[in-house]
């Protein structure tokens, strides 16, 4: 995928996140798995992000492919994530996937929940 094509996507999937997903899928020996990101009610700011691995792509789901792996977002969650970026970090505070969300007006201290 080119940078130009990447710029037109409603949600981006960073190289770091794609590389981590690829490594995890190799460990699981299941290339059919995809990283699903979703938004649910809850957390200290109203909404929270969730991540899970899923073999299915449901009707209406939006997918982004990078480095041979897929990120999947359901239509309800996508409306809160448009313009966002799924990334991965590893540091002293642990390792995790996270969302850089330009739609979030407030976030909690750990970045796991947000409001719009």
Swiss-Prot record:
Cofactor: iron-sulfur cluster
Pfam families membership: Fe-S_biosyn (PF01521)
Keyword Nucleotide-binding: no
Domain of life: Bacteria
Cofactor binding note from Swiss-Prot or TrEMBL: Binds 1 iron-sulfur cluster per subunit.
Organism: Shewanella oneidensis (strain ATCC 700550 / JCM 31522 / CIP 106686 / LMG 19005 / NCIMB 14063 / MR-1)
PANTHER family: IRON-SULFUR CLUSTER ASSEMBLY 2 HOMOLOG, MITOCHONDRIAL (PTHR43011:SF1)
InterPro entries named in the record: FeS_biogenesis, FeS_cluster_insertion, FeS_cluster_insertion_CS, FeS_cluster_insertion_RrpA, HesB-like_dom_sf
Job description of the protein: Required for insertion of 4Fe-4S clusters for at least IspG.
Example GO BP: iron-sulfur cluster assembly
An annotated Gene Ontology molecular function: 2 iron, 2 sulfur cluster binding
Database matches in HAMAP family: Fe_S_insert_ErpA
Sorted UniProt keywords: Iron, Iron-sulfur, Metal-binding
Binding site for iron-sulfur cluster: 44, 108, 110
Family: Belongs to the HesB/IscA family.
Name used for this protein in its record: Iron-sulfur cluster insertion protein ErpA
Assembly, per entry: Homodimer.
């Amino acid at each position: 995928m080119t940078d130009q094509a990447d710029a037109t996507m409603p949600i981006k999937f960073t190289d770091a996140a794609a590389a981590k997903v690829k490594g995890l899928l190799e460990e699981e020996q299941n290339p059919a798995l995809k990283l699903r990101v979703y938004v649910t009610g809850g957390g200290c700011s109203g909404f929270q992000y969730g991540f899970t691995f899923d073999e299915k792509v449901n009707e209406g789901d939006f997918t982004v492919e990078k480095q041979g792996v897929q990120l999947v977002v359901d239509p309800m969650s996508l409306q809160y994530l448009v313009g966002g970026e799924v990334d991965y970090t590893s540091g002293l505070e642990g390792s995790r996937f996270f969302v850089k969300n330009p739609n979030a007006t407030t976030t909690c201290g750990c970045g796991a929940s947000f409001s719009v």
